[in-house]
Amino acid sequence: MSEWCFKYHVEIWAYCLMPNHIHLIAVPQTKEGLNLAIGEAHRRYTRRINFRKGWRGHLWQGRFASFIMEENYLLACTRYIELNPVRASLVNKPEDWPWSSAKAHISGKNCILVNTKPLLDIVNNPWKTFLSCDVGHSEIETFRKHERTGRPLGDGSFIKRLEHTLNRKLRLQKPGPKR
């Protein structure tokens, strides 16, 4: 993953590899970078594991899904991601899950995949303290909804700026023919 993120100019700020899916906070520097990096990493990893295990087919549930997120949601989403193995009862503490950015954030040191600085610069408390509170059920549902729909997550002015920049409608439209 780190090889392809480097090649296609994508920074990973947080991640958690779960048994059947992965969560990332990825910041692409180019328009196509995210699709190219994730797509190539997924293909290579799937091919390697399938060959090693004698398997065929997909390793992950569902397709690659992404959504643009306003900075206001960044910390809650990071908390959601790094606490995922705790919520799934795989570990008691997030730093005990070896396939997550939690340990890198707690130590304050980058690992081969994660750039810890952007998020550590925002959080004023030690990272362990930051992870001591889980996100609320409504926030979890919000993240899952935007992951399913691919619609941007942000307030009205954020969505409006995106619509202007991309020259397309992003807000939910009423069903039926458009006038």
Model-found features: residue ranges?
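Short Pro-Cys-Gly-centered "Cys-loop" motif that presents a nucleophilic cysteine in a tight turn
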Residues: 1-14, 18, 27-179
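Broad gene-expression machinery/nucleic-acid interaction feature
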Residues: 21
